[in-house]
Amino acid sequence: MFLRRRRLIAATGLAAASAALPRVAIGQTDRRPSITIAVQQISNSASLEPLREQSNVGSRTFSFIFETLIMQNLMGQLEPMPGLAESWKRIDERTVELVLRKGVKFHNGDEMTADDVVFTFSRERMFGPDYDITNPKTLFTSVLVRDSVEGKKLPPEVPAVAKRSFPALEKVEAIDKYTVRFTNRTPDVTLEGRIGRLGSDIISRRAYEEAKTWMDWARAPVATGPYKVREFLVDQSLLLDAHDDYWGGQPPIKSVRLVVVPEVASRINGLLAGQFDFICDVPPDQIPGIEKNAKFEVLGSPIVNHRLTVFDSHHPTLADPRVRQAFSHAIDRQAIVDSLWSGRTRVPAGLQWEFYGPMFVENWTVPDYDPAKAKALLKAANYKGDPIPYRLLSNYYTNQVATAQVLVEMWRQAGLNVQIEMRENWQQIFEGNGQRAVRDWSNSAGFNDPISSIVAQHGPQGQQQQVGEWTNAEMNKLSDAMEIETDMTKRKAMFKRMLEICEREDPAYTVLHQNATFTAKRKDISWKASPSFAMEFRAVNFATN
């Protein structure tokens, strides 16, 4: 298992491929194509900083720009592979040592060294000046107050995300110019996974320090990925140029332009008219219409992300867990998959994925569809039909509004009076004025362990608890224990108990279905979709016919 590896992992994949890739000589005509990709959104936070933009749309955007020491194989099943580190080894239960690739260039031409890695994980860039390793609390306050950042001060969500990602990181030190060592305060079998997750992307120290303000940096970050930022227009477009000194070989595309096109119909019409080369987040019911045109095809599949309905247990009606249980039993999930997703995804085994390997809890299921049980639970809870608000965005997620309408009807049939309240952005979803009760969310796993999902998102430092929607003392105790437990059998038992609490006994959420993402493109472009939101546009995955 990746998380328990002790052996040195040899460099493969991109490194081997890059040796065979020629670089363009200065002055040689550049015949590489430029492409345009229409997306629903580029960034929710008006920034390109992974420590602030922890979102589905950010995951797609950042795959062009950033890289981690240990990467996920986007052309495989997201298994770990050497990235900016060519190899790594376990020193002990608290320590991992990594050997960096030599000759890796940042977008500004500087060579990446251990100094940049150490700075990436520093207080100045990640944890903030008040970082206390002995204090488990994060500093999360509000959500995506987009333009509130002053000077070089870190936005409050940056140290919160950093602490959530690395709750006990003691130090990162340079052993020599190309060797770094991560040391945790406590044992952590997931340390390699944390090093490879979104937010652990290596940045240029010089570029960060030279930026006049944090927002200047966050809108034009300098990293090592195959494409570099030329221009970012918030909520409009992102223009990227090929990073021709890229360590993995010359990128196959001269420039990539991502444009924000929120409406599905506009994205599809733009593709068919030749305005766009790729469009993202295509609803399944639109796939046949697109593929009637022989010039286009749609690729995609279920990904490592689940769609959820999330509860605020502080709402007077939802304070009784039986009401939240009734919500879960009133949902015919398979009907949603069959009708809105044309059977192209599935109802998963709760908030987990098979790539957890031995940590996957077999024989676990989502709550069964049982309207009679839902009605009985509501009767036992003495629910009288009071309205329950459901804050909703307009199709941030694929099929979001249609799914919400189906859910409201299913809940109505069970006796729940749920009222949709449309909101414009995530800040309005989370704001405390009025009564919060039900909202949409999706959860991914940043690496192959439950720590990266149920603990990171619903544990004591997770977003749901940090914004004050839900808490559970036993869940929090288990989360803290699982962070430091090294016995995999004990860890799995802890995870199973977390699922029982969060999905059955005191519901924090209920899983609707596994998410799926579908990308439509020109058929004369050879390209494959990955099992995640990230898009792979290195030379191994792009060619024009």
Would you name each region that the model predicts?
Residues 215-218, 244-289, 300, 417:
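Ligand-site clamp/hinge motif
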Residues 346-380, 394-401:
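Structural transition elements
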Residues 38-92, 122, 220-223:
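N-terminal lobe/hinge region of extracytoplasmic solute-binding protein
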